[in-house]
Amino acid sequence: MSETVSAKKFGKVAVMLGGTSAERPVSLNSGNAVLAALTRQGIDAHAFDPATRSLGDLMSGEFDRVFIALHGRYGEDGCMQGALELLGIPYTGSGVMASAVGMDKWRTKLLWRAAGLPTADWAMLDATSDFAATEARLGLPIFVKPAREGSSIGMSKVTEAGTLQAAYEKAAEHDALVLAEKFIDGAEFTVGIVGDSALPLIRLQPAAEKAFYDFEAKYLRDDTQYHCPAGLPDAQEMSLRKLALDAFRLLGGRGWGRVDLMTDRLGNPYLLEVNTSPGMTDHSLVPMAARVAGIDFDALCVTILEQTLG
């Protein structure tokens, strides 16, 4: 903990976890890990699950600030951030606008493309789409994903002609907005952001039989490989870190977050998506990169919370 910041200065902290989104189980793991870390540091932290408690309890319970460990809808998409703004309670992470835009992969890509930042070509799908024409335009393989879900929920990799519609229907079970994205053949990276700095890159390498870095690879398997340092030349590492920071700031991101990207076989980068409330589980990526940067998990949680002191 910062020498100038004592545990008492944080007052009473609500660690918001769980919620009602499809990512509730991951959020419970994240929140409980954060709660344990803050408690170890002597901070008066308490679990707060908005699925079972009223937000009015934040006021009646005299909470001074909130550590948001929610993932997905109603926790990561600006809704909770807006409620906390109205209540006048400081909270961790991005504000209303950046949270809402960051949760929407389509609008995120629109902003990046308009600003000249590199992102893979895409098409939006609905039940009336010409799926054959989309396959022809983007080429196979194609990634299909709900535009407003995280943790790779509802995501598919289309590798055979004529199967795009089935992938769309799977994604549409989770969101009315469905994104079809051109496959980038290369390496996948993630960049954690804390404050004004980008953490060391992590290169993701799912097990050989996995088609992509899906929910199972993220949270359930132990054979997914994470390379940090990523093994890139220093100049390329710093260039990708800067790109991630630029992409995060363009959306109005603040506090902390994570940006996912890929490089093709020639080393050209392509932004994939931004996460304004990343996971904090034992499989999570921001804590992993922070450790490489010399920041242990407890210190990371306190650093994120310190940003609510203003």
From Swiss-Prot:
GO cellular component: cytosol
Biological-process GO terms, alphabetical: cell wall organization; peptidoglycan biosynthetic process; regulation of cell shape
InterPro entries listed in its UniProt record: ATP-grasp (IPR011761), ATP_grasp_subdomain_1 (IPR013815), D-Ala_lig_Van_CS (IPR000291), D_ala_D_ala (IPR005905), Dala_Dala_lig_C (IPR011095), Dala_Dala_lig_N (IPR011127), PreATP-grasp_dom_sf (IPR016185)
Superkingdom per UniProt: Bacteria
Keyword Repeat: no
One Pfam family from the record: Dala_Dala_lig_C
Annotated catalysed reactions: 2 D-alanine + ATP = D-alanyl-D-alanine + ADP + phosphate + H(+)
Location(s), subcellular: Cytoplasm
Its EC number(s): 6.3.2.4
Cofactor list: Mg(2+); Mn(2+)
GO MF assignments: ATP binding; D-alanine-D-alanine ligase activity; metal ion binding
Role summary: Cell wall formation.
Protein name as it appears in the record: D-alanine--D-alanine ligase
Native source organism of the sequence: Thiobacillus denitrificans (strain ATCC 25259 / T1)
